[in-house]
A protein has these predicted regions:
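Conserved beta-strand hairpin/beta-sheet module of binuclear metal-dependent hydrolase folds
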Residues: 1-42, 219-236, 254
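Active-site neighborhood of phospho(di)ester-bond hydrolases with catalytic His/Asp-centered motifs
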Residues: 26-29, 49-57, 78-80, 233-236, ...
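Active-site metal-binding motif and surrounding structural segment of the metallo-beta-lactamase
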Residues: 32-85, 253
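Short, hinge-like loop/turn segments at secondary-structure boundaries
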Residues: 43-44, 93-99, 225, 252, ...
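Metal-dependent catalytic neighborhoods of phosphoester/phosphodiester hydrolases
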Residues: 63-72, 93, 316-323
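Metallo-beta-lactamase
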Residues: 81-219, 223-229
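Cap/insert and terminal regions of metallo-dependent hydrolase folds
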Residues: 242-342
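Short, basic/aromatic-enriched C-terminal tail that caps enzymatic domains
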Residues: 338-354
Length: 354
């Protein structure tokens, strides 16, 4: 079993969890092109992906899921509230549904094509020898003047009318069906899971657990290989460490743990105070100090490797995050064998294999 962190940070998150038989992508917070590029760099074959799993609907975790899932034709696993929140994010801001909005746009286009076709029809010249008298008596319009359609709608027929020119250039436009707009929320397959309920994909058993974060239904994951029972976990984007998260992270061999910010750097940094309050809240992000406290007081010491992830580029320094974690482990002699790595925003981390 192996973990490959493709990206971790405020600008995008994505991790591969794989065995010899099954390969999963956890979050897709980069563009499809960038995800494919990073998988190639890490030696992971995108065509071998079995599914995408989503922790929550924030942009740095879902930016590329639609394009990637449609391109690879693979299922996406959400909790139902997370899926609904993602759909709402991509649906046009309106009181109507996406289908109703699309139908309205197509009707408008058909109406414009009909008006253009009517505008292109020139009136028949009168069949009278006295043209001036006929025009005066019959009320026929001057050439280029506006006329009334059968439905009493005023339509201009000037030779320079852009609608008329457009219709003349493409007389078959009204017969051409409007091209359907791609639904950005379409996915090949959507599968729902529930926090606390085990499910399996291939030979990987997955246990989602609830995390405290300001999203619809955020979760972390524990992955277990059926072959050798190796266990890996992802626990990022959480404001604090509640008892259920501490319990979920026991007997883990490789742990991706959030260490988002240094408290002093955040407080003195450029973020607006409202954003600082959000990050510091119980549904925000785990600080270096909070991650270190978990390692010192509640961590059972079972991990082969601890990866510190989701480091803020604005409000953290990798050396500070590493120092806090190392000092926490140094306080417990039994934990000195644990290896600590730092996930990066700009490049994949080398695969961690068990």
């Amino acid at each position: 079993m192996r973990m490959t962190v493709l990206a971790s940070g405020s600008k995008g998150n994505s991790t591969v969890i794989a065995t010899d038989n099954t390969r999963l992508l956890i979050d897709a917070g980069l563009s499809c092109r960038e995800l494919l590029k990073r998988m190639a760099t890490a030696g992971e074959d995108p065509a071998a992906l079995a599914a995408i799993l989503i922790t929550h609907e924030h942009q740095d975790h879902i930016a590329g899921i639609g394009v990637l899932a449609r391109r690879l034709r693979i299922p996406v696993y959400f909790t139902e509230p997370t899926h609904r929140a993602w759909v709402r994010m991509l649906t046009p801001r309106s009181t109507i549904t996406y289908a109703q909005w699309l139908d309205h746009v197509q009707q408008e286009k058909a109406a414009r094509a009909e008006a253009a076709a009517a505008a292109s029809a020139e009136p028949e010249p009168p069949c009278q020898p006295d043209v001036e008298s006929s025009a005066t008596n019959s009320g026929a319009p001057e050439p280029g003047a506006p006329f009334m359609t059968a439905s009493s709608s005023w339509v201009g027929t000037s030779a320079t009318d852009p609608i008329a020119l457009s219709a003349a250039a493409d007389p078959d436009e009204e017969d051409t069906p409007a091209a359907p707009k791609a639904d950005p929320t379409h996915l090949p397959t959507v599968e729902y899971f529930h926090a606390g309920v085990h499910f399996s994909i291939g030979d990987i058993s997955i246990t989602p657990f609830t995390i405290p974060h300001d999203a619809a239904d955020p979760c972390g994951f524990v992955f277990e290989s059926a072959a050798d029972h190796a266990r890996m976990a992802i626990a990022t984007d959480l404001g604090y460490m509640p008892p259920n998260v501490k319990a979920a992270l026991r007997r883990i061999d490789v742990l991706l743990l959030e260490s988002n910010h240094d408290l002093d750097m955040l407080k003195d940094g450029p973020y607006p105070w409202s954003v600082k309050q959000r990050v510091l809240s119980r549904v925000g992000h785990l600080s270096n100090a909070a991650a270190a406290e978990f390692l010192l007081r509640d961590y059972d010491g079972g991990a082969h490797t601890i990866v510190l992830g989701h480091l803020s580029e604005q409000n953290n320094d990798p050396s500070l995050a590493l120092l806090a974690a190392e000092q926490a482990l140094a306080g417990r002699m039994s934990l000195l064998g644990n290896r600590i790595l730092l996930a990066q925003q700009s490049a994949p981390l080398p695969s961690i294999c068990l």
